[in-house]
UniProtKB/Swiss-Prot annotation:
Annotated phenotype, changing residue 728 to A: Inhibits t/bra expression and mesoderm induction
Taxonomy of the source species: Eukaryota, Metazoa, Chordata, Craniata, Vertebrata
PTM entry text: Phosphorylation of both tyrosine and serine residues, together with dimerization, is required for mesoderm induction.
GO cellular component terms listed in the entry, alphabetical order: cytoplasm; nucleus; plasma membrane; RNA polymerase II transcription regulator complex
Protein's organism: Xenopus laevis
Motif (Essential for nuclear import): 150-162
Quaternary assembly: Forms a homodimer or a heterodimer with a related family member, such as stat1. Interacts with nlk.2.
Record's protein name: Signal transducer and activator of transcription 3.1
Length: 769
């Protein structure tokens, strides 16, 4: 199998790393379009030989032209546009340096191979690799590591120069004092001054050399601080910011965030280098106190250099204090950032500067809405107190990887009650599930004479008082983290921004893929788009308001889109997870599409879809049959809800479902799961096998056992549309009488089912129904 095809089948955590490999330098779209050709070329050889690189690059442009022609024939305007843009970019950037693109592609292919090896090793071990995310290093990260190595080398070089200048200064100081004492003695004895003048000239030469070396060191220090500033900006403004954004995405069901260990190593390395430089700057002060002169560069520049390195170190320490694990209730691990009052929640903070001397030295304090103060009262938000163990000392022993961290496991929130029942302002415009609160972590660092105040915040949390508020609270968390990377915008919902369908579709798919093994397909998402936006051809870029997503009722329904979808998600997780993971549930499909795909199938073909009218979440099956005149009929059963699925699994309902005609003959209308999977093959393994054990008499002296029973779902119907079903009817030996008249099954071709407790003789009990 081609390498690219193998990569597409990897778990989500590996696909996230695959995405990080590609950038504008080598777009993933190009990798997708030309996968077989790209894998057939020797890019490593091209990266080392310019003539071959030029040939491969021109062949690449030719392959792009051929692919463009194919898209032209398919009238695929979007792909045509993207491919033309990619070709223009490649020509402008790599036409004069084809070895560079060869090196980039070779590196990507090599990293892909490593990723596949890591995934394969994890599969053989029956679990995830130790750190699968650590296997991929992007080109940008390679450059960052190179910059860090350069910084460390410059620090070492500077230390050597400092030793040289110290030795030179000691020589100068010794010679100067010796000459001074000799000069004093010569004046007393009246000796010749020519020797003294000669030694003075030597001292002047030494002082000139000392001054030049000092100026070189000052210049090197300034240059090194600039390099450190660049690396630090890359670490904090790019790498750490990217990690925080990925953490946001992971919180709302997106791909799992990568490990912090690599970032910790980088930041710790930079912090160590900064402290070394600070010691060198202090050493300059000592040298200045021993020897100084007019125009001394140390006097002029040392204070500014020291101020600069201290500021860099302070900022690095502040940025390195992060929330590694966001607030989450242990009973709801898939819905972090929603906290119920009175229920314990956990979170974890970490300092990415791993200095052993800081172990057990930093005491962390937790508070909520620290910066809000009276502002919260003005906007009507509730106020809370944090109960439980709200202080903890950071240490390296509790973490498996030895990181300097503190985990809070026993925190709870209690609302501060006001005179009007809890809310500071009864005129508040936001409902409680739109209120955002910040949990703050504070500590102080004392290190090498510096005192640094550290503070970090959780992502905004929603606090609920009843679990029934969870769906709307989770919708708020989704909307916030989907649309902003501002970690402190607690007023977000006073004027919530508009999202696009592309953003919403991705997040909706995550709600399934994060808790099951399957996300949503393009067709399923299109059906959801139609529910939200109405009929359309292309929903890409269409705007969706917060109110439409969560607050307004859908057309013709008494509930919002999100309430409906969230209940379906709950239905999937609790009742039909295995069937969803198998891909047996089509789920979201319009009735028009449903009719179109079933009408061409043989009678007995059925599909499973979610109910559009059930607020609490329901699932139904629709099948095709032919009436007595040969006309195709599409029938749907009344949706099954959570309450019904509590008593009987959906697989057993499908396997045992029957239609009863006017002559009391039972027929199974469900034969093939769309497109052509035999019902028994799909659902048989999820049904409980009937006991074959010998039944003992239940009454003393009795020789006959009780009859076994089995629950089945039956739809009574007076029509004769079931005559052409491929499954032959079977008359049961014993059948209970209907309780009342049959339900109306004619409205909307939707059948209502009745559940029967069927008595079976010992003979028929062992045979399938």
């Amino acid at each position: 199998m081609a390498q690219w095809n193998q990569l597409q089948q990897l778990d989500t955590r590996y696909l996230e790393q695959l995405h990080q490999l590609y950038s504008d330098s080598f777009p993933m779209e190009l990798r997708q379009f030309l996968a077989p050709w790209i894998e057939s070329q020797d890019w490593a050889f091209a990266a080392s030989k310019e003539s071959h690189a030029t040939l491969v690059f021109h062949n690449l442009l030719g392959e792009i032209d051929q692919q463009y022609s194919r898209f032209l024939q398919e009238s695929n305007v979007l792909y045509q546009h993207n491919l033309r843009r990619i070709k223009q970019f490649l020509q402008s950037r790599y036409l004069e340096k084809p070895m560079e693109i060869a090196r980039i592609v070779a590196r990507c292919l090599w990293e892909e191979g490593r990723l596949l090896q890591t995934a394969a090793a994890a599969a053989q071990q029956g679990g995830p690799a130790s750190h699968p995310n650590a296997a991929v290093v992007t080109e940008k990260q390679q450059m960052l590591e190179q910059h860090l190595q350069d910084v460390r080398k410059k620090v070492q070089d500077l230390e050597q120069k400092m030793k040289v200048v110290e030795n030179l200064q000691d020589d100068f100081d010794f010679n100067y004092k010796t000459l001074k004492s000799q000069s004093d003695l010569s004046e007393l004895n009246g000796n010749n001054q020519s020797v003294t003048r000669q030694k003075m000239q030597q001292l002047e030469q030494m002082l000139t050399a000392l001054d030049q070396l000092r100026r070189t060191i000052i210049s090197d220090l300034a240059s090194l601080l600039s390099a450190m500033e660049y690396v630090q900006k890359t670490l904090t403004d790019e790498e750490l910011a990217d990690w925080k954004r990925r953490q946001q995405i992971a919180c709302i069901g997106g791909p799992p965030n990568i490990c912090l260990d690599r970032l910790e190593n980088w930041i710790t390395s930079l912090a160590e280098s900064q402290l070394q430089i600070r010691q060198q700057i202090k050493k300059l002060e000592e040298l200045q106190q021993k020897v100084s002169y007019k125009g001394d560069p140390i006097v002029q520049h040392r204070p500014m250099l020291e101020e600069r390195i201290v500021e860099l170190f302070r900022n690095l320490m502040k940025s390195a204090f992060v929330v590694e694990r966001q607030p989450c209730m242990p009973m709801h691990p898939d819905r972090p950032l929603v906290i119920k009052t009175g229920v314990q929640f956990t979170n974890k903070v970490r300092l990415l500067v791993k200095f052993p001397e800081l172990n057990y030295q930093l005491k962390i304090k937790v508070c909520i809405d620290k910066d809000s103060g009276d502002v919260a009262a003005l906007r009507g938000s509730r106020k809370f107190n944090i109960l439980g163990t709200n202080t903890k000392v950071m240490n390296m022993e509790e973490s498996n990887n030895g990181s300097l961290s503190a985990e809070f496991k026993h925190l709870t929130l209690r609302e501060q009650r006001c005179g009007n029942g809890g809310r500071a302002n009864c005129d508040a415009s936001l409902i409680v599930t739109e209120e955002l609160h910040l949990i703050t972590f504070e500590t102080e660092v004392y290190h090498q004479g510096l005192k640094i105040d550290l503070e970090t915040h959780s992502l905004p949390v929603v606090v609920i008082s009843n679990i029934c508020q969870m769906p709307n609270a989770w919708a708020s968390i989704l909307w916030y983290n989907m649309l902003t990377n501002n970690p402190k915008n607690v007023n977000f919902f006073t004027k919530p921004p508009i999202g696009t369908w592309d953003q919403v579709a991705e997040v909706l798919s995550w709600q399934f893929s994060s808790t099951t093994k399957r996300g949503l397909s393009i067709e399923q998402l299109t059906t959801l788009a139609e529910k939200l936006l109405g009929p359309g051809v292309n929903y890409s870029g269409c705007q969706i308001t917060w109110a439409k997503f969560c607050k307004e009722n859908m057309a013709g329904k008494g509930f919002s889109f999100w309430v409906w979808l969230d209940n379906i998600i709950d239905l999937v997780k609790k009742y039909i997870l295995a069937l969803w993971n198998e891909g047996y549930i089509m789920g979201f499909i319009s009735k028009e599409r449903e009719r179109a795909i079933l009408s061409t199938k043989p009678p007995g073909t059925f599909l499973l879809r979610f109910s559009e009218s059930s607020k609490e979440g329901g699932i139904t099956f629709t099948w095709v049959e032919k009436d007595i005149s040969g006309k195709t009929q599409i029938q749907s059963v009344e949706p099954y809800t959570k309450q019904q699925l509590n008593n009987m699994s959906f697989a057993e309902i499908i396997m045992g479902y029957k239609i009863m005609d006017a002559t009391n003959i039972l027929v199974s209308p469900l034969v093939y799961l769309y497109p052509d999977i035999p019902k028994e093959e799909a659902f048989g393994k999820y049904c409980r096998p009937e006991s074959q054990e010998h039944q003992e008499p239940t009454d003393p002296g009795s020789t006959a056992p009780y009859l076994k029973t089995k629950f089945i779902c039956v739809t009574p119907t007076t029509c004769s549309s079931t005559l052409d079903l491929p499954m032959s009817p079977r008359t049961l030996d014993s059948l209970m009488q209907f309780p009342g008249e049959g339900a109306d099954s004619s409205a909307g071709n939707q059948f209502e089912t009745l559940t029967f407790d069927m008595e079976l003789t010992s003979e028929c009990a062992s045979s399938p129904m």
